[in-house]
Amino acid sequence: MKPYGLVLFNLIKLNVLRLFRCRKLRVAHVELLGHQMCFRLKRNATVSLGERLVSDGHGTILVDENAELQIGNRVYFNEDLMISVKNSVTIGEGCRFGPGVKIFDNDHVFDAENGVSDRHVSAPITIGNHCWIAANVVILKGTQI
């Protein structure tokens, strides 16, 4: 039996995000998101969440201005997920993610003389359909699976 209170809470949370923060948020029927799932969406972000999305436990999804996140149908995220999007992340249908997975389509600019900069470089990430990503995997900018 589904925890219907949590499903209702997620519907309210996602609709408030769409109304006040991210007008380009498209949500199909989300199955279950952990109550500690945190969405930080900038105003011009484009986010599409597919049908039957399930996320256990806590996680964080950050989508910057003019960035795009697409998550297909029947995707499962285990706990301690982190997705940071400054360009584009696309996740296909039927994907499964183990605990502790991190997805970053961006990185700080770094050089030996000046160290770490506040600037970022980014490149799209594409994860195809029916992929299984094991525990504690880190997926970086420009990756195609």
Regions found by a protein language model. Give the residues of each.
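Extracellular/periplasm-exposed beta-strand and loop segments of Gram-negative cell-envelope proteins
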Residues: 107-108
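A short acidic, helix-capping loop that chelates divalent metal ions and anchors anionic groups
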Residues: 112-114
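Domain-scale signature associated with acetyltransferase and cell-envelope carbohydrate enzymes
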Residues: 1-104, 125-130, 136-139
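Short beta-to-alpha loop/turn elements within the nucleotide-binding domains of ABC transporters
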Residues: 142-143
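Glycine-rich NAD(P)-binding loop of Rossmann-like domains
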Residues: 116-128
